[in-house]
Swiss-Prot record:
GO terms for biological process: mismatch repair. Pfam families: MutS_I, MutS_II, MutS_III, MutS_IV, MutS_V. This protein is involved in the repair of mismatches in DNA. It is possible that it carries out the mismatch recognition step. This protein has a weak ATPase activity. Keywords: ATP-binding, DNA damage, DNA repair, DNA-binding, Nucleotide-binding. Signal peptide: none annotated. ATP binds at residues 725-732. Residues 67-79 have a biased composition (Acidic residues). GO terms for cellular component: cytosol. It comes from Prochlorococcus marinus (strain MIT 9303). InterPro entries: DNA_mismatch_repair_MutS, DNA_mismatch_repair_MutS-lik_N, DNA_mismatch_repair_MutS/MSH, DNA_mismatch_repair_MutS_C, DNA_mismatch_repair_MutS_clamp, DNA_mismatch_repair_MutS_core, DNA_mismatch_repair_MutS_N, DNA_mismatch_repair_MutS_sf. It comes from the Bacteria. Residues 44-80 are annotated as: Disordered. GO terms for molecular function: ATP binding; ATP-dependent DNA damage sensor activity; damaged DNA binding; mismatched DNA binding. This is DNA mismatch repair protein MutS.
Length: 927
C-alpha cells in the first residue's frame, strides 16, 4: 500500500495525519488512471509492479445510518391480503416479471417453502409468506404484485441468517427450495438471473448449523416386495450420509425386521416409491420418520442401474457387488435420483464431480454385526435414556471420550453395531491395550486430535461445492496434522487394524493439497465469498493487476481529500464511504455553508452534511467496476481451488475415517485407564464370566456412595439364572450391566470388571419393564407378551437373554404359568444364556428339575421394620419380595401398609404350595 493510501485509510477511521504531503497528493490527482484495462494489460502491469504479500485491504466503510434503513410496509393482519393467500389464485400474466418468475418456480416445488433472493433478503410470497410468518414469528408484509393485482403477502429473512431460519423450518418438518442470484449485474433490460440452486430436506442438508456434529445424518430409501404365495415380504434399503459420504445398502426379509432396522437407523428422512392411491405411511414405517414419496420410475431396476452407472461414471455395475441384492440396488438408484433432484445446479456435474460425492455403496449383510432390536436398544439405553431421551445417562455418554466430531460418530456406530468377528475385536483390543499401557502416547495423540476439524464433513462440503474459504483452511489444518499422527502410530503400533492403513500410508497428494490451500488463501478469510479479501497477493497476475489499480484509486482518493480540504478551507473535512450512498465529503453543519460551488449536496443528517463532486462521482464508478472485477476474479480463483479440493474428497475422507477410528480407540483407552477397567478375554465359546463387574453408567452417576460390584457366570454349566430379590434392590441394574458389558466387549473396549471372559453373542435380547401401546391397541400385558414371543422365536444358544418380570399383567396363576413355561423353554430347548429377574419365587423350583438352571438373589438386611438394600448378588433363591417394606419406604400411608401386612398374612395361610403344582415332575409336557 502506498503512503497516500495509508493516509486515506487513517482518515476514514480517525483524524488526518498532520504530516500529510499535499504536494505529493496533488501530483497523484493529475495522474491519468484507467479502469478499462484488458486482462492481459493488467497481467503485464502486475509484472511491472509486483506486490508484497499481505492481507488485502478491505474497502473502508461506515455503518448504515438509522434514518437510511429501508422501512418495510407492514400489513395490519392477514386479512389485509385476503385474495392472494395462495399462488394458484392469481393470474401469472398480471404479475410483475419478478413475481411471475417466483410463481413459475413455486409451481415446480409446490410442497416446499420457496426462498427467493432479493438483494440482502430471501423473500417468500403468497402461502409461503403466511406460513413462514406464523412458524418463525416474522412480520407479514406486502409487495405490489402488478396492475390489477395489488399487494400480495410477503415475508423474508436476511440472507446472512438464512441458514438459521432454514434449520427451524426443517425442524418443523418442512423442506426448503433456495432460489439464489446467479449473477451480480443483470443484462440490459432484463431481470437479474435467478434459479433454484439447492433444495434443503432433513436428509440432504450440508450446512454445519443444520447437522448434529456427533451423529450421522442418514437419508434412507426403501423398496419393498409384499409377500405373495410362498414368497416372503422382502425389502431393500439404501442409506447415505451426504455430509460424510457413507453409503450402505442391505436386503432382507420380514416387515417386522424392516420396522426394527428403520427404528435403529434413526434416519432423518426416508424416501419410498408411491403409487397413486396407496397409503402414505405403511405399517412398517415408524411414525417419527420424515417420509418423502417419489414416483416409481427411479426405483425400477433398469432406471436404477442407469442412475448408478451415470453417477459413478462406470461402464458396468459388476464391481459394486449389487447383483445379489436387487432390491437394495433399486433403493440406491432412487436415493441417488433424489439427491440429483435436490441439487439442480450442482457445479461441475458434467466434468464428473458428483453433486453429492458419495462412496461406492457398501453391502451390509444380516450376520455382520451383533443384532440389537429396538426394544433392547431402549432398555440398555445405548445412546439416550429410556425415561426422558437424554444423552447424559446413556452408555455412549459414559464411554465417549472422543475429541473430534468424526470420532464421536464412529464410536456411536460401533456401539450401535458391535462386532461378531473375534479377530476384528482383538485387533481393536490390541490398539486399546497399547494405548492404556503407554500413557505418554495416549496423551500425545489426544493433543493432536483435540483441534482436528471434521474432515469427513468438510470434504463433503468441498466436493458438493458448498465449502467456504474458512472450511478449506480447516481442511488444510487437518491434513497438516495427519503426518504427525501417522508418525506417532508408526513408532508405537506394530500391529494395527487394516483401516488404519489409510492414515499410516497417507496419500501423498494430500500434503500438496494443503500446501496449495495455504499458498492461496489467507489464514483467516472472511465468511463472504463475493466481497474479496480471500486470496494472498502473488497468487494470480490478473488479480494482482486489479489490486494495483485499486491501490492507485485509493491514492487518488487520498489526494482528492487533501485537495478538497485546501479548496474548502476546512481541515476537518473527511472523505468517507457508505455502502448505500457511495463516496462523499462530510462536513459539520456549521461548515456546510462554506463549501465550494462545485460540491453537490447528497445527504443531510442531524450533525453533518454530505456532498459529492463530479470528479468524485466519476471516480466512484471506476472504483466500483474495478472492485467488482477484483472480487469476481477472487471468487473464480476460490472456486477453482474448491474444485481442486473436492476432487480429493475421497482421499480426505479415507484418512478422516482412519482418524475417526483412532479417536474412538484413544477415547476407549482413556476410559479404560481412568475407570479401572479390564481387558476381556474374547472367544467363540458360550461362556460369560465376569468378576466384580460394575454398571458403566450407574457407577459414574453415583456421587455419595460407591457402586457395589457383582459376579456373573453363564454358559459353562449354567444357562439360566433365576434372580429373585426385593423391589428396588438392583435386579434391573444387574441385568443391564450384564448386557452392556457383553456389548462393550464386542465393540473392542475394555469392560468395568476385575476379570472378564466373554463368549461372542449373536444377539442380545432384553425385556425390562413395559408400557401400554395405546396407539396400537395393546395393553401392558400384550406388549410384554409380544416382546417375549419375539425373543422365543429368534433366540439361539449363542444369544444373551435378559428378562425382568414376565406375566405380571394378568392373573397370578396365569402369569406364573407363563413365566415357568418361558423359563423352561429357554433353558431346556433354546439353551440361551439367560438371566430372569422375577418376583415369582416359585420359579426357584425350576433348578430342581433342570441341571443348567441356578438360583441367585439380591441380598437385603432386615432390622426390625428397617430394610437395607445391600445390592449384592449371592447364590440361592429369595423367598420374600419385601414389597410391603418397599411401599413403606416409598411413602405409602402407614394405615395402608399395616392393612397390607394383614392381607399378606392371610394369603400365606391360604397358600396352595404353587411350586408343587408347577413341578416338572407333576406337569406332563405334551408333544
Amino acid at each position: 500500500m502506498t503512503a497516500n493510501a495509508e493516509l486515506l485509510q487513517g482518515s476514514l477511521f480517525g483524524d488526518l495525519e498532520p504530516q500529510a504531503n499535499a504536494e505529493s497528493c496533488s501530483e497523484t490527482i493529475t495522474r491519468a488512471l484507467r479502469n478499462d484495462l484488458s486482462d492481459q494489460e493488467l497481467v503485464d502491469e502486475s509484472l511491472k509492479r509486483p506486490r508484497n504479500r499481505h492481507k488485502p485491504t478491505s474497502v473502508p466503510s461506515i455503518p448504515l445510518d438509522s434514518e437510511s434503513q429501508e422501512q418495510l410496509e407492514t400489513a395490519d393482519n392477514d386479512n389485509d391480503l385476503p385474495a392472494w393467500a395462495h399462488h394458484t389464485l392469481v393470474d401469472p400474466e398480471q404479475l410483475t416479471p419478478m413475481l411471475r418468475h417466483y410463481v413459475e418456480l413455486k409451481a415446480k416445488h409446490p410442497e416446499r417453502i420457496l426462498l427467493y433472493r432479493l438483494g440482502d433478503f430471501f423473500e417468500c410470497f403468497f402461502e409461503d409468506a403466511i406460513q413462514l410468518s406464523r412458524l418463525l414469528e416474522l412480520t407479514l408484509t406486502g409487495k405490489e404484485g402488478g396492475k390489477g393485482i395489488g399487494r400480495v403477502p410477503m415475508a423474508g429473512v436476511p440472507h446472512h441468517a438464512a441458514e438459521r431460519y432454514c434449520t427451524e423450518l426443517i425442524r418443523h418438518g418442512l423442506s426448503v427450495a433456495i432460489c439464489d442470484q446467479l449473477e451480480t449485474t443483470p443484462s440490459k433490460g432484463a431481470l437479474l438471473k435467478r434459479d433454484i440452486t439447492r433444495v434443503l430436506t432433513p436428509g440432504t442438508v450440508l450446512a454445519e448449523g443444520m447437522l448434529t456434529a456427533r451423529r450421522n445424518n442418514w437419508l434412507a430409501a426403501v423398496v419393498v416386495e409384499p409377500a405373495q404365495g410362498n414368497q416372503p415380504f422382502c425389502w431393500g434399503l439404501a442409506n447415505a450420509d451426504v455430509s460424510t459420504g457413507e453409503f450402505l445398502v442391505t436386503q432382507r426379509e420380514g416387515s417386522a425386521e424392516l420396522h426394527q432396522h428403520l427404528a435403529q437407523l434413526e434416519a432423518s428422512e426416508l424416501i419410498m416409491a408411491q403409487k397413486i392411491g396407496e397409503s402414505s405411511r405403511p405399517a412398517w414405517c415408524p411414525e417419527q420418520l420424515f417420509l418423502t414419496t417419489m414416483a416409481t420410475t427411479p426405483f425400477s431396476q433398469p432406471e436404477a442401474e442407469r442412475t448408478l452407472l451415470n453417477h459413478y461414471r462406470l461402464s458396468t455395475l459388476d464391481g459394486l457387488g449389487l447383483q445379489e441384492v436387487p432390491l437394495a440396488l433399486r433403493a440406491a438408484g432412487g436415493l441417488l435420483t433424489y439427491l440429483r433432484d435436490t441439487q439442480p445446479l450442482a457445479e461441475n456435474v458434467d466434468e464428473g464431480i458428483a453433486p453429492m460425492p458419495l462412496e461406492h455403496p457398501l453391502t451390509v449383510f444380516a450376520g455382520d454385526a451383533l443384532v440389537l432390536d429396538a426394544q433392547t436398544r431402549r432398555n440398555l439405553e445405548l445412546t439416550s435414556t429410556q425415561r426422558d431421551g437424554q444423552f447424559q445417562g446413556s452408555l455412549l455418554w459414559a464411554v465417549d471420550r472422543t475429541l473430534t466430531a468424526m470420532g464421536a460418530r464412529c464410536l456411536r456406530r460401533w456401539i450401535e453395531a458391535p462386532l461378531l468377528d473375534s479377530k476384528a475385536i482383538r485387533a481393536r483390543q490390541a490398539v486399546v491395550n497399547h494405548l492404556v499401557e503407554t500413557r505418554s502416547l495416549r496423551h500425545s495423540l489426544r493433543r493432536l486430535l483435540r483441534p482436528m476439524g471434521d474432515l469427513e464433513r468438510l470434504a463433503g462440503r468441498a466436493g458438493a461445492g458448498h465449502a467456504g474459504a474458512r472450511e478449506l483452511v480447516a481442511i488444510a489444518d487437518g491434513i497438516e496434522r495427519l503426518p504427525r499422527l501417522a508418525e506417532q502410530l508408526h513408532n508405537a503400533l506394530r500391529s494395527a487394524p487394516n483401516w488404519l492403513d489409510n492414515l499410516l500410508t497417507l496419500d501423498k497428494s494430500l500434503p500438496k493439497l494443503a500446501a496449495s490451500i495455504r499458498e492461496q488463501l489467507i489464514n483467516n478469510p472472511p465468511l463472504s465469498l463475493s466481497e474479496g479479501g480471500l486470496m494472498h497477493d502473488n497468487v494470480d497476475p490478473l488479480l494482482d493487476g486489479l489490486r494495483n489499480q485499486l491501490d492507485d484509486q485509493d491514492t487518488w482518493l487520498a489526494g482528492q481529500e487533501v485537495q478538497e480540504r485546501k479548496l474548502s478551507g476546512n481541515p476537518n473535512l473527511r472523505l468517507q464511504y457508505h455502502r448505500t450512498f457511495g463516496y462523499f465529503l462530510a462536513v459539520s453543519k456549521a461548515k456546510a455553508s462554506m463549501v465550494p460551488d462545485h460540491w453537490i449536496r447528497r445527504q443531510t443528517l442531524a450533525n453533518e452534511e454530505r456532498f459529492i463532486t463530479p470528479d468524485l462521482k466519476t471516480r466512484e464508478g471506476q472504483i466500483f467496476q474495478l472492485r467488482a472485477r477484483a472480487c469476481q476474479r477472487e471468487y473464480e480463483l476460490f472456486c477453482q481451488l474448491r474444485e481442486q479440493v473436492g476432487k480429493q474428497a475421497t482421499s480426505i475422507r479415507k484418512a478422516a475415517r482412519a482418524v475417526a477410528g483412532l479417536d474412538a480407540l484413544v477415547g476407549l483407552a482413556e476410559v479404560a485407564a481412568t475407570g479401572d477397567y479390564c481387558c476381556p478375554e474374547i472367544d467363540n465359546s458360550r461362556e460369560l464370566q465376569l468378576k466384580t463387574c460394575r454398571h458403566p453408567v450407574v457407577e459414574q452417576l453415583l456421587v455419595e456412595r460407591s457402586f457395589i460390584p457383582n459376579d456373573v457366570e453363564l454358559g459353562k454349566d449354567i444357562d439360566l439364572v433365576v434372580l429373585t430379590g426385593p423391589n428396588a434392590s438392583g435386579k434391573s441394574c444387574y441385568l443391564r450391566q450384564i448386557g452392556l458389558i457383553q456389548l462393550l466387549a464386542q465393540v473392542g473396549s475394555w469392560v468395568p470388571a476385575k476379570q472378564a471372559r466373554v463368549g461372542i453373542a449373536d444377539r442380545i435380547f432384553t425385556r425390562v419393564g413395559a408400557v401400554d401401546d395405546l396407539a396400537a391397541g395393546q395393553s401392558t400385558f400384550m406388549v410384554e407378551m409380544a416382546e417375549t414371543a419375539n425373543i422365543l422365536h429368534h433366540a439361539s444358544d449363542r444369544s444373551l437373554v435378559l428378562l425382568d418380570e414376565i406375566g405380571r399383567g394378568t392373573a397370578t396363576f396365569d402369569g406364573l404359568s407363563i413365566a415357568w413355561a418361558v423359563s423352561e423353554h429357554l433353558a431346556r430347548d433354546l439353551r440361551s444364556r439367560t438371566v430372569f429377574a422375577t418376583h415369582y419365587h416359585e420359579l426357584n423350583g425350576l433348578s430342581q428339575e433342570l441341571t443348567n438352571v441356578a438360583n441367585s438373589q439380591v441380598l437385603v438386611e432386615e432390622t426390625g421394620d428397617d430394610l437395607v438394600f445391600l445390592h449384592q448378588v449371592a447364590a440361592g433363591g429369595a423367598n420374600r419380595s419385601y414389597g410391603i417394606e418397599a411401599a413403606r419406604l416409598a411413602g405409602v400411608p402407614d394405615d395402608v401398609v399395616q392393612r397390607a401386612r394383614q392381607v399378606l398374612a392371610q394369603l400365606h395361610d391360604d397358600d396352595s404350595s404353587l411350586p408343587a403344582l408347577l413341578s416338572a415332575k407333576t406337569i406332563k409336557r405334551q408333544s
